[in-house]
Curated annotation (Swiss-Prot):
GO terms for molecular function: NADH dehydrogenase (ubiquinone) activity; quinone binding. It is a peripheral membrane protein. SUPFAM superfamilies: Nqo5-like. Its EC number is 7.1.1.-. It comes from Acorus calamus var. americanus. It catalyses: a plastoquinone + NADH + (n+1) H(+)(in) = a plastoquinol + NAD(+) + n H(+)(out); a plastoquinone + NADPH + (n+1) H(+)(in) = a plastoquinol + NADP(+) + n H(+)(out). HAMAP family: NDH1_NuoC. This is NAD(P)H-quinone oxidoreductase subunit J, chloroplastic. The gene is ndhJ. NDH shuttles electrons from NAD(P)H:plastoquinone, via FMN and iron-sulfur (Fe-S) centers, to quinones in the photosynthetic chain and possibly in a chloroplast respiratory chain. The immediate electron acceptor for the enzyme in this species is believed to be plastoquinone. Couples the redox reaction to proton translocation, and thus conserves the redox energy in a proton gradient.
Length: 158
């Protein structure tokens, strides 16, 4: 079974993979990083005018990093807006995903947080820099292979 956006993408021969539906009935799609730019624009034109949230996670040690976008179609007079969840998987060694800041401005801080915590580089983001950690921080704290520094050793050194 396909959701409305997935059916539309198939009809227009746009590459994606349906991952089924979550517990709320929201369709989950997988998009390749190189296709995300065009599918994000198409999603906006299709009516997904609100980026509810963007987050990222480390799929597995040594595996892919995922950037997740929850999009909603906000329309007047509609009590149950249509939603879709889009996952973009990037290789761990050089995780690059096109930024959607220019489509949904609310992606600004959310993409910066994903960069700060996992090291995903959002291409064409206007201010991609750390937002939670100091600029001097080394590494990506939410990666499963991250080794936390020993803060007691650092304090004792002073």
């Amino acid at each position: 079974m396909q959701g409305r956006l997935s059916a539309w993408l198939v009809k227009h021969e746009l590459v994606h993979r349906s991952l089924g539906f979550d517990y709320q009935g929201i369709e989950i799609l997988q998009i390749k990083p190189e296709d995300w730019d065009s599918i994000a624009v198409i999603s906006y034109v299709y009516g997904y005018n609100y980026l509810r949230s963007q987050c990222a996670y480390d799929v597995a040690p040594g595996g892919f990093l995922a950037s997740v976008y929850h999009l909603t179609r906000i329309q007047y007079g509609v009590d149950q807006p249509e939603e879709v969840c889009i996952k973009v998987f990037a290789p761990r060694r050089n995780p690059k995903i096109p930024s959607v800041f220019w489509i949904w401005r609310s992606a600004d801080f959310q993409e910066r947080e994903s960069y700060d915590m996992l090291g995903i580089s959002y291409e064409n983001h206007p201010r991609l820099k750390r937002i939670l950690m100091p600029e001097s921080w080394i590494g990506w704290p939410l990666r499963k292979d991250y080794i936390a520094p020993n803060f007691y050793e650092i304090q004792d050194a002073h």
